[in-house]
């Protein structure tokens, strides 16, 4: 089957999703140096050049490493993937939970090419503690990609969302900013101690 690049350690559901789609995980292991995870770009370049690698599941910010990838790091990933025809699925579900001194950069914001050769997955489930409502957004600029996503979620019957979930999503994003800022202060306080 086709190969999907993942940067380990990573959220365990990535692996079951890859297997369930008949694909094989290709590992770009993150390096752990002096208490910080970094990307092995030489290894990423080598693995992305394999014609059987079709997709990269990018976790940005990274879970569980806690790294908020810099714009420069993301630009290197984009360059490697674009040159090798590797499509990027950016799991950016933790994007609202960034501590002071770090800046989250959406992968799709890097360039027009990155926008058209990626999809972004976000959800209020982590930042607003709404995992139980099981709702997320998949953002794709390319019309053909949106059609493929629509077919895939309908085949897997994950498209039916209850009305409570929609209301919760709208309330979280529309009225939850004050609560989210308080949560981030609380979490950062725990992190500092």
Language-model features, listed with the residues they occupy:
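A short helix-loop-beta submotif of the ANL/AMP-binding
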Residues: 20-26
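Hydrophobic/aromatic ligand-binding patch that stacks against planar heteroaromatic rings
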Residues: 16-17, 80, 110
């Amino acid at each position: 089957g086709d190969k999907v690049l993942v940067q380990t350690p990573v959220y365990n559901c990535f692996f079951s999703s890859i297997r369930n789609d008949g694909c094989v995980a290709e590992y770009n292991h993150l390096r752990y140096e002096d208490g910080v995870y970094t990307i092995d770009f030489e290894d990423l370049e080598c693995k992305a050049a394999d014609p059987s690698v079709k997709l990269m599941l990018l976790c940005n910010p990274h879970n569980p490493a806690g790294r908020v990838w810099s714009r420069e790091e993301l630009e290197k990933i984009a360059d490697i993937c674009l040159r090798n025809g590797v499509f990027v699925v950016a799991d950016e579900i933790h994007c609202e939970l960034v501590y002071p001194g770090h800046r989250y950069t959406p992968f799709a914001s890097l360039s027009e090419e990155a926008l058209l050769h990626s999809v972004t997955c976000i959800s209020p489930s982590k930042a607003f503690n709404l995992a139980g409502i099981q709702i997320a957004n998949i953002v794709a600029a390319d019309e053909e990609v949106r059609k493929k996503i629509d077919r895939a979620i309908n085949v897997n019957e994950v498209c039916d969302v209850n009305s409570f979930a929609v209301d919760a999503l709208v309330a979280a994003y529309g009225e939850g900013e004050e609560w989210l800022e308080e949560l981030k202060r609380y979490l950062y306080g725990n992190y500092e101690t």
